[in-house]
Amino acid sequence: MAIHLTEAAQQALIGDNASKGLRDYIGATPKLRFYTGAQNANEESLPAGTLISTHTLAAFGAVSGGTITSVNATADAVTAAGGTIACWVLLKADNSTKILDGSAAKTSGGDIILDENVVVGAGATVKMGNLALNMLHGNE
């Protein structure tokens, strides 16, 4: 039998106006990094692949329907090592405290879907749009 999270608990976990939650834990200017290689099996560790790009995100806004969204992220130049983007990590503003990670793909099958090619050359620009995080509740 599955564990079900109530909507009120979902809102509190992600950070509604009454509780700090994940939104406050993430902070004002979190970093999103894209890497080559697979997502690390250890949720506490960074990927073993090569760092492709680092993006500074805007603070996540107020929760709406269990979702918080960061809009107007910066676009950063790719590091000297190009490659195939395959995973990502979200870090606090200190650029070292890991919050979560996932896989990346071009069309489907990834936790983040890229609009452009997953293969990028050295010195290319990887553009970042909005990032939404959703905390599911009930049977979602």
Predicted regions and their residues:
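Small cysteine-rich, disulfide-bonded extracellular modules of the LU/uPAR three-finger superfamily
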Residues: 1-88, 92-140
